[in-house]
Regions:
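An active-site-proximal structural segment forming one wall of the substrate-binding cleft
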Residues: 4, 60-89, 97-99, 103-141, ...
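Extracellular glycoside hydrolase catalytic/binding regions
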Residues: 2-3, 8, 162-312, 325-332
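Charged, glycine/proline-rich intrinsically disordered loops and linkers
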Residues: 40-62, 328-347, 409-414, 421
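Aromatic-rich peripheral "rim/lid" segments of glycoside hydrolase catalytic domains that contact
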Residues: 294-387, 392-394, 398-400, 404-406
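Outer-envelope exported proteins of Gram-negative bacteria
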Residues: 22-23, 92, 130-136, 186-188, ...
Length: 501
């Protein structure tokens, strides 16, 4: 493997441009309650740890977490991810467990936890994919929420200078340890720092990024350094004072995207900042939606030269993550207790958590998620998710979406306005959110389709109206399926693509 590096706004692996396609390994080394269906009452590692101690006792809880880390993500997962044609994973880490803080704030690795990072790196090297180190939970918390294991729901990384000093030393130690490892794709310095209700801390973010970069560069000149915007990695105004000269130091900017319009227009602030700084963009987190949204969004990133990392790879009993595991028998007793119900006896609670560990070891995969992300058949492509267009007719009022496109996008029920993409549980778009593509005579759109094995495919277009459609499969040469209207007017809902036996 070769070190990843940037050049003139493009990400390279050696001499070849590369688009990152990856999976976010959330829930492993920094568990989140919602991935266990605990939600807000037990939503972060420190509260989950307290629950285990409370219900099962100290000795059991300590052994549980050792078994959990050994089972949640294994070599089998990395092999499967690589086998799907993906090239990277992003590992969410918790500083509270990765490091021990001694007297006078001396920092050293916690070897038992570090072993899991090293194991993941070894698996990634074996299967030829990159590992990105993601500081998901920084000292004191950079977000002040469940996602950073915050103690007090305040981003204390920015209220206590001591926490910043400790973080600088942590990244320095990581860079020393992994500086000669080309399979480490880069260092993601802070996950989703500073939500907008704490924006008064925003002026501290760029100076901290600069300080962290200097500390890393003192010991590691080769690895990419990745900087996220504020407010769930969506506010790039924090980079207004960042210069192209600074950004030329193998820097990548990262944004996250959830539950919003999957169109180019929504990415404009990120693209504009990246162009000004002449750096690549990475969509480092996005997902937790439905197949339609995935089929719109992720191919769009690639069309724009933006790499991506899906979140989250594995969760309990969901239809919209690539890997899932069953809820163990008796789990409702745990969630009922969190809601104020009866406390399970220690022996009963231990048995339930033992079954939980068995469940995470015997999950199942959902390859349809990967097919949606990569546009591989069999799959269904929403008509509005076209990647190329040649539209002769004028745009009409309809869905306020893909605003700079010339094509008309209509709601099937005839209303106008913005689309609602909030499908947290993976449910399909409701009837009032069905979007149709209106094609008139002479209109032409192209949908990217990936067919690496050159399988024979069948394309069925679901449409309404009296117009005549022509479909041309040029995936072998152009990677596109072209749909055109040769006469009349027709409303297209989707392309259903199957593999012929």
């Amino acid at each position: 493997m070769e070190f990843l590096h940037t050049n003139n706004g493009v990400l390279y692996c050696g001499k070849n441009p590369i688009i990152l396609r990856g999976m976010g390994l959330g829930g492993w080394l920094l568990p989140e309650g919602y991935m266990w269906k605990f939600y807000t009452k037990c939503d972060r590692p420190r509260r989950m740890e307290k629950l285990l101690r409370e219900l099962c006792g100290e000795r059991y809880a300590e052994a549980f977490w050792e078994r959990y880390y050994d089972r949640y993500i294994t070599e089998r997962d990395i092999a499967w991810i690589a086998g799907q044609g993906l090239n990277s994973v992003r590992l969410a880490m918790n500083a509270r467990h990765l490091f021990d803080i001694g007297e006078q704030d001396t920092v050293r690795f916690h070897t038992a936890y570090l072993r899991h990072v090293d194991d993941c790196l070894a698996w990634c090297k074996k299967y030829g994919i990159y590992l990105f180190l993601d500081m998901h939970g920084a000292p004191g918390g950079q977000t002040g929420q469940n996602i950073d294991d915050s103690e007090s729901d305040i981003p204390e990384l920015f209220t206590d200078r001591r926490n910043q000093d400790i973080l600088v030393e942590m990244w320095r130690l990581l860079a020393i340890r992994y500086g000669n490892e080309p399979a480490i794709g880069g260092y993601d310095l802070l996950n989703e720092p500073i939500p907008n209700w704490n924006r008064r801390y925003n002026p501290q973010l760029l100076p901290l990024y600069r300080r962290l970069t200097r500390a890393i560069r003192d010991v590691d000149a080769r690895h990419m350094i990745i900087l996220e915007g504020a407010h769930w990695a969506t506010d790039f105004s924090v980079f207004d004072d960042y210069t192209p000269e600074e950004a030329a130091d193998n820097i990548v900017l990262e944004f996250h995207k959830y539950w919003s319009d999957p169109d180019e227009e929504s990415l404009a602030p990120f693209v504009e900042t990246a162009k000004r700084l002449n750096v690549p963009l990475w969509m480092g987190e996005g997902g937790e939606n439905n197949l339609q949204w995935y089929t719109y969004a992720f191919p769009m990133y690639e069309r724009l030269g933006i790499g991506w990392c899906f979140w989250a790879y594995k969760k309990m009993e969901v239809p919209n993550s690539p890997a899932t595991f069953e809820k163990p028998e008796g789990w409702d007793q745990i969630t009922a207790y969190l809601d104020g119900g009866e406390r399970p006896a220690p022996e009963a609670a231990q048995a339930i958590f033992d079954r939980f560990l068995n469940c995470i070891s015997h999950g199942e995969y959902h390859p349809e998620i990967i097919r949606a992300l990569t546009r591989r058949p069999p799959l269904e492509i929403p008509a509005g998710a076209y990647d190329a267009e040649d539209i002769q007719s004028g745009r009409r009022a309809g869905s306020v979406f893909r605003r700079t496109s010339k094509a008309t996008l209509l709601f099937a029920d005839g209303h106008t306005g913005e689309a609602d993409w909030r499908r947290y549980g993976g449910e399909a778009q409701p009837e009032d959110q069905r979007i149709l593509l209106r094609l008139s005579e002479g209109d032409l759109v192209g949908d990217r389709l990936e067919n690496p094995e050159n399988q024979k495919i069948r394309i069925h277009v679901r449409s309404y109206g009296d117009g005549i459609l022509d479909v041309q499969d040029l995936t072998a040469g152009q990677g596109l399926v072209w749909v055109s209207c040769s006469s009349g007017i027709i409303n297209v809902e989707n392309l259903h693509i199957t593999i012929e036996e």
